Amino acid sequence: MQTVAVIDYGMGNLHSVAKALEHVGAGRVLITSDAKVIREADRVVFPGVGAIRDCMAEIRRLGFDSLVREVSQDRPFLGICVGMQALLDRSEESGGVDCIGLFPGQVKFFGKNLHEEGEHLKVPHMGWNQVTQAVDHPLWHDIPDLARFYFVHSFYIDAANQRQVVGRGHYGLDFAAALADGSRFAVQFHPEKSHTHGLQLLQNFAAWDGRW
């Protein structure tokens, strides 16, 4: 039976992610901060919620920045929400925070004056929204284009390499909702909270061989 390591650095909705993975039959799901267990896992999930400065402080304290770079190279790897944002170069949150740098680009604030067709939009962006599939990817298997996923975020990803953008969202402005590069896949939304389509994405991740 394959193992899926859910990285625990004290800043994630770990149990809901783990339960969703177990629900789709992903294998033996381990919530862990043990680097040895993470290195030995067949697949790795990197969730995250909260302030990016606090997240990156814990990631660096535990040495997980280098560990994430290592394990995401040679096996299926999934970043979720702030776990996705931590994979970018830098976030402007909290006055500016350097991140892990696996995907080129910046994490930017939606702003206080966000509008759509004359209507003021509340920040954070919270609730269901469509994701446009920019390119075909194994993790989109059996998920229709413009499927709705659940988002909770005040900061969005401005990707520097548009070829890595495999899913796009829109909330007053366009943003990267999903990024992919090799065996790495990352989403701004919460698949574990996104009902049928979110569970399908996790099932696809559990079956994915990491090639793209």
Curated annotation (Swiss-Prot):
State the oligomer form and interacting partners: Heterodimer of HisH and HisF.
* Catalytic activity reported: 5-[(5-phospho-1-deoxy-D-ribulos-1-ylimino)methylamino]-1-(5-phospho-beta-D-ribosyl)imidazole-4-carboxamide + L-glutamine = D-erythro-1-(imidazol-4-yl)glycerol 3-phosphate + 5-amino-1-(5-phospho-beta-D-ribosyl)imidazole-4-carboxamide + L-glutamate + H(+); L-glutamine + H2O = L-glutamate + NH4(+)
The subcellular localization recorded is: Cytoplasm
A Gene Ontology BP annotation from the UniProt entry:
L-histidine biosynthetic process
GO cellular-component terms in the record? Answer: cytoplasm
Q: Write the protein's name.
A: Imidazole glycerol phosphate synthase subunit HisH
> InterPro entries attached here?
Class_I_gatase-like (IPR029062), GATASE (IPR017926), Imidazole-glycPsynth_HisH (IPR010139)
User: At the top level of its lineage, which domain of life is listed?
Assistant: Bacteria
**UniProt entry keywords in alphabetical sequence:** Amino-acid biosynthesis, Cytoplasm, Glutamine amidotransferase, Histidine biosynthesis, Hydrolase, Lyase
A Pfam family that this protein carries is: GATase
Q: What is its EC number?
A: 4.3.2.10, 3.5.1.2
Give the record's pathway.
Amino-acid biosynthesis; L-histidine biosynthesis; L-histidine from 5-phospho-alpha-D-ribose 1-diphosphate: step 5/9
Q: What does this protein do?
A: IGPS catalyzes the conversion of PRFAR and glutamine to IGP, AICAR and glutamate. The HisH subunit catalyzes the hydrolysis of glutamine to glutamate and ammonia as part of the synthesis of IGP and AICAR. The resulting ammonia molecule is channeled to the active site of HisF.
The record's active-site residues are C81, H190, E192
Q: MF terms per GO, please?
A: glutaminase activity; imidazoleglycerol-phosphate synthase activity; lyase activity
Record-annotated Glutamine amidotransferase type-1 domain positions: 3-212
SUPFAM superfamilies, sorted: Class I glutamine amidotransferase-like (SSF52317)
